Every structure is written in structure tokens, then in C-alpha cells.
């Protein structure tokens, strides 16, 4: 109970700090921070990486021999790719693109009757402001290190690994049983991404490097899930997989730098 009280007190204090900082710099200051987070401090290679990968949805759309364009899927794919690249770079602006992507992807998943993806996307949408708060709180409350890095990556201990793997199994089985109760055709298949996405988002919010392992698992399974359904979403998850490998590498370097 004492630890819970301390965490609640810390949450309230951090929220006050974030709110006070936002009021101090004003709307113009917030926009300036957003601009810097999006565009400042990126190397030439990172710019090329961002431009090339975010062009994949456009290439897929305009090289297909179709009479009409699937603009919703294209925009969902584009915002998703930009989001995960910003995550790999440790930029808080990823949550803006994540919120937009989640809203569009929710509609696509509902249309495809992928109920597991629907629930996961609702969870993602809710987690975006929470994640943004966590990242901003981390920066504001430790401003001495803010100039050195966009974020302070951490790594899981053996005990943490066991805890999060157990949580993954619980979510997978629990959601599988829930889908089974509503007569889903493939209940435990649908619940796979609920588990990997849910734990991955938790690790991302807490700035753990191992989030990328869960993202890789999610991406590979999602490619299988969307195979033959939507070329844009397939392409998005292939890019996600590549970016997850890059993200693992970048966050591993950040962990070693903080050690």
C-alpha cells in the first residue's frame, strides 16, 4: 500500500510539473518544441531512412493497376511508418502520429472483422496521451540529461523478463477465451497481437529496449494476418519489421551509453 501511495503521489507531482511547464512556455513554445522534436537533430542518413521508408505506401499505391485509390489505407500505412521511425529515434512526437494511425487503423480492422486488432487499436489510442505524458515527465524531471539524449533507454532484468512474459501469456489466454465466448472463428489466433502489442506498448511507455522484441513478434504475425487482405497494411508491417531491427540497435546503443 505504501508503494502504491508513493506512485500515486509521484504521478500527481509529475503531472503538475508537466502542466506547469506547458503553461510557462505557452502554445507557441509547445509548437516550437514539436517542431524541434520532429525536425532537429536528425543526421543525413536518418533523413534518407525516413524519406525512403515513408515513401513505401505511395510506391505501393501508384504502382498497382487499380482504377481507384485506397487513400485511407495509404494514410494509415504512412502515419504508422512515420510513427515507428520516430519511436526508434526516441522522439516524443511519435505519439501524435500514433494517435492518427490508431484512429484510421481501427476503421480498417473493423471493416476486415479482425476483432483482436480492433481491441488492440483501441488500447493503442488510449495509450498515446499516457505515453506522451510519461516521456514528457521523464524529460522535464531530469532536465540535466535532456540535452544529451532524447530519451533514457533501459533494459529488463531477468525478473522483469519473467514478469512480462507471464503477462503476455495471461493476456493471450484471457483474450482468447473472451473471443471464444463470442464464437470467434480463430479466438487464440486473434489474441496473439493483443498480447504482444499490449506488452510492447507498456515497455515502450516505460522506455525499455526489449519493446522491440515484442514489436518484431507483432509485425511478423500481423503480416500473416493481413496476407491477401490489404497491400498497404502488409507493406506497413514489413517496414515495421525492418524498423524494429533498427530500433533494437539504436536503443541498445542508448542503453550502453546510459550504463
Predicted regions and their residues:
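Polytopic alpha-helical membrane-helix bundles and their juxtamembrane interface segments
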Residues: 24-88, 125-128, 135-259
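Short, Lys/Arg-rich, polar N-terminal cytosolic tail immediately upstream
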Residues: 1-40
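Hydrophobic/aromatic-rich structural module bridging two neighboring secondary-structure elements via a short loop
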Residues: 92-134
Amino acid at each position: 500500500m505504501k508503494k502504491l501511495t508513493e506512485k500515486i503521489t509521484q504521478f500527481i507531482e509529475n503531472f503538475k510539473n508537466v502542466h506547469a511547464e506547458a503553461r510557462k512556455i505557452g502554445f507557441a513554445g509547445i509548437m516550437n518544441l514539436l517542431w524541434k522534436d520532429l525536425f532537429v537533430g536528425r543526421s543525413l542518413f536518418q533523413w534518407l531512412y525516413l524519406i525512403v521508408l515513408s515513401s513505401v505506401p505511395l510506391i505501393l499505391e501508384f504502382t498497382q493497376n487499380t482504377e481507384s485509390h485506397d487513400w485511407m489505407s495509404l494514410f494509415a500505412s504512412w502515419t504508422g511508418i512515420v510513427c515507428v521511425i520516430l519511436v526508434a529515434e526516441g522522439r516524443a512526437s511519435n505519439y501524435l502520429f500514433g494517435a492518427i494511425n490508431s484512429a484510421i487503423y481501427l476503421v480498417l480492422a473493423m471493416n476486415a472483422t479482425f476483432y483482436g486488432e480492433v481491441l488492440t487499436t483501441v488500447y493503442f489510442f488510449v495509450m498515446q496521451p499516457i505515453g506522451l505524458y510519461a516521456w514528457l515527465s521523464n524529460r522535464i524531471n531530469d532536465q540535466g540529461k535532456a540535452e544529451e539524449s532524447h530519451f533514457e533507454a533501459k533494459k529488463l532484468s531477468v525478473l522483469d523478463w519473467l514478469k512480462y512474459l507471464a503477462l503476455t501469456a495471461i493476456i493471450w489466454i484471457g483474450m482468447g477465451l473472451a473471443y471464444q465466448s463470442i464464437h470467434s472463428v480463430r479466438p487464440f489466433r486473434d489474441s496473439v497481437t493483443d498480447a504482444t502489442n499490449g506488452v510492447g506498448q507498456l515497455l515502450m511507455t516505460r522506455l525499455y529496449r526489449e519493446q522491440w522484441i515484442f514489436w518484431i513478434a507483432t509485425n511478423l504475425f500481423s503480416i500473416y494476418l493481413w496476407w491477401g487482405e490489404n497491400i498497404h497494411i502488409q507493406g506497413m508491417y514489413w517496414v515495421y519489421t525492418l524498423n524494429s531491427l533498427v530500433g533494437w540497435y539504436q536503443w541498445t546503443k542508448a542503453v550502453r551509453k546510459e550504463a
